[in-house]
């Protein structure tokens, strides 16, 4: 994710005020907002010092309650208290009803089949509910940072489809907030640990949240995160640990027929017990019944481990499957990043370490790591220059192009073009019967490939064996909002294509860019001269090759004297082309062209004569 903010050579990077931007982890269970301040990245607390906001929204006749206040009423008013709305994002009502889980809400259906929650304030959709969760986070950020936000980065699960991603953007749009980027949660976690600027290799993101488990296997290559495989269980999370504890308590206390209020009370106590056992060998569980009876029991860590062992084992099985899908082994995994509050459970950390063979990264609060990564990315994208190697690129700092015959650079995307951008150009074959074409993608402002930065090489095969110049290959350069360049070459008649991805900004510093730009200005006149020479040399080679083929086929159309003159001129062109006088090469080519015009006319006449031989006027 390394991006670049550049200035013209000789100028300082334009000084500007620190722009305000935040990263938001819009979670299933809890949501957080984080920002970079004075070079330090941290989540922002509310007035009570709470960093996480429960992702819960309650609708009453007069108000909308969000977070802890809504959570207090969830047991008494479950029908109007919407929890885990993220699970409804981008899903149809039919999908929700077809699932195994039942919900206490009253649903209606929108015209396009999406779910609507029926509340005392009317029907609301998941996007509107999500906007209510975002609202206090945005307000908290603006109050803490002391100004209006220029934009936000919101994290989403890697498996979110287009509809779910668009729904997340729409939620922010309802509040008038600019979304700088939607960032995959695994990538955000990796960024938080600075893994995007470290060695290349495979990274595992083990994300055990309240309601879901996700395992993502990423490959970091030249600053680009590639998702190799994802897996997990959308119905397995810390909540399941709580339910097992609740069932254990009910069994010990011999509680059978319980109402929804007692059930919610037991669940809240189960969560507290789970959290206490993170650091303690045992803890006391306590519940007060409606008649005032106080129930207590001691729950040990060993008992809790036994309860959840099967579920933790299930997550490890998912890790094993996902690694197999990715085609990598545990030995190839450089780091394992722990995400989600449930990864605090000691048994989880022990099992993950045992499986991957190395201690997982846990130094950043697993509840906050995704928001922190999003904040780092937001600070980059909004235009701030943090004290790190991560710099902003919202324009192309150096032109992107392709090598053509003679070692010349054909620029496809010019520098200072804003991104995202797509540009296409057509190229053709140089030789008769050419069935493949090698592409060399370069970066820089100079005219010759030797003076530019090599980015990538790839080959297009399967080009029809046509005459030189007859095949048409369309080359498309596409740079996305993350600065990732995709180059695709397609032969138009067959549709055969090949492509490659590369990060143009990877490994480039401001100084290197400035040097490359200064060199392009310093050597501009020389470069143009060298380009003109190379172009004439390529043209000379093309003309000579074409003429050699024509003479081999139709040389009998010339008498000995004519053939001798043409051969002599061809030798002269070859000799002049070996020199460094572009004008002389051009004149030699023009002389050869004049000398062979009569030969070209005879070839045309002969071709027509052969084509029409034996045919009558009526058949033509």
Curated annotation (Swiss-Prot):
One of its GO terms (biological process) is iron-sulfur cluster assembly. Pfam families: HSP70 (PF00012). The keyword ATP-binding applies. The gene is hscA. This is Chaperone protein HscA homolog. Keywords: ATP-binding, Chaperone, Nucleotide-binding. It comes from the Bacteria. Disulfide bonds: none annotated. Belongs to the heat shock protein 70 family. GO terms for molecular function: ATP binding; ATP hydrolysis activity; ATP-dependent protein folding chaperone; unfolded protein binding. The keyword Chaperone applies. Gene3D superfamilies: 1.20.1270.10, 3.30.420.40, Actin, Chain A, domain 4, Substrate Binding Domain Of DNAk, Chain A, domain 1. Chaperone involved in the maturation of iron-sulfur cluster-containing proteins. Has a low intrinsic ATPase activity which is markedly stimulated by HscB.
């Amino acid at each position: 994710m390394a991006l670049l903010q550049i200035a013209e050579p000789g100028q300082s990077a334009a000084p500007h005020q620190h722009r305000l931007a935040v990263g938001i982890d819009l979670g299933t269970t809890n949501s957080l907002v984080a920002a970079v301040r004075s070079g330090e990245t941290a989540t922002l607390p509310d007035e009570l010092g709470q960093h996480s906001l429960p992702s819960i929204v309650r609708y009453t006749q007069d108000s909308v309650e969000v977070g802890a206040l809504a959570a207090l009423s969830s047991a008494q008013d479950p029908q109007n208290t919407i929890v885990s709305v993220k699970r409804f994002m981008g899903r149809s009502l039919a999908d929700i009803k077809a699932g195994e889980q039942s919900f206490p809400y009253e649903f209606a259906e929108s015209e396009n089949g999406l779910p609507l929650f029926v509340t005392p304030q009317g029907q609301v959709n998941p996007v509107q509910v999500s906007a209510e969760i975002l609202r206090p986070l945005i307000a908290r950020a603006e109050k803490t940072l002391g100004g209006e936000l220029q934009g936000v980065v919101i994290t989403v699960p890697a498996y979110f489809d287009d509809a779910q991603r668009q729904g997340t953007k729409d939620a922010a749009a309802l509040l008038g907030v600019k979304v700088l980027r939607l960032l995959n949660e695994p990538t955000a976690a990796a960024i938080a640990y600075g893994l995007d600027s470290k060695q290349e290799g495979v990274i595992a993101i083990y994300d055990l949240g309240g309601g879901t488990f996700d395992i993502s296997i990423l490959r970091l290559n030249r600053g680009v995160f590639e998702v190799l495989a994802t897996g997990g269980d959308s119905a397995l999370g810390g909540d399941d640990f709580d339910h097992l504890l609740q069932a254990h308590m009910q069994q010990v206390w011999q509680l059978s027929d319980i109402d929804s209020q007692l059930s919610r009370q037991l669940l809240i106590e189960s969560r507290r017990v789970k959290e206490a056992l993170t650091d303690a060998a045992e803890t006391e569980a306590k519940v007060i019944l409606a008649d005032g009876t106080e129930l207590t029991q001691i729950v040990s860590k060993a008992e809790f481990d036994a309860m959840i062992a099967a579920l933790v084992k299930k997550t490890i099985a998912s890790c094993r499957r996902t690694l197999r899908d990715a085609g990598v082994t545990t030995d190839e995994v450089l780091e394992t990043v722990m995400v989600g509050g449930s990864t605090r459970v000691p048994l989880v950390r022990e099992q993950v370490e045992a499986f991957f063979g190395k201690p997982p990264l846990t130094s950043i609060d697993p509840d906050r790591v995704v928001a922190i990564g999003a904040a780092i990315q937001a600070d980059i994208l909004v235009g701030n220059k943090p004290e790190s190697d991560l710099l902003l690129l919202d324009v192309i700092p150096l032109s992107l192009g392709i090598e053509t015959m003679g070692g010349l650079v054909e620029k496809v995307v010019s520098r200072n073009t804003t991104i995202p951008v797509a540009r296409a150009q057509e190229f053709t074959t140089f030789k008769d019967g050419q069935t493949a074409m090698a592409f060399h993608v370069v970066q820089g402002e100079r005219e010759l490939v030797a003076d530019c930065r090599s980015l990538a090489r790839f080959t297009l095969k399967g080009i029809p064996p046509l005459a030189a110049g007859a095949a048409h290959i369309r080359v498309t350069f596409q740079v996305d909002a993350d600065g990732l360049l995709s180059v695709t070459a397609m032969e138009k008649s067959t549709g055969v294509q090949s492509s490659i991805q590369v990060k143009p900004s990877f490994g480039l510093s401001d100084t290197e860019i400035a040097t490359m730009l200064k060199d392009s200005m310093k050597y501009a006149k020389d470069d143009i001269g060298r380009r003109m020479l190379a172009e004439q040399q390529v043209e000379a080679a093309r003309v000579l090759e074409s003429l050699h083929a024509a003479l081999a086929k139709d040389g009998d159309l010339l008498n000995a004297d004519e053939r001798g003159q043409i051969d002599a001129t061809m030798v002269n062109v070859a000799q002049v082309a070996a020199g460094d006088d572009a004008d002389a090469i051009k004149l030699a080519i023009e002389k050869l062209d004049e000398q062979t015009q009569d030969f070209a006319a005879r070839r045309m006449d002969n071709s027509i004569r052969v084509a029409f031989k034996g045919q009558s006027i009526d058949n033509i």
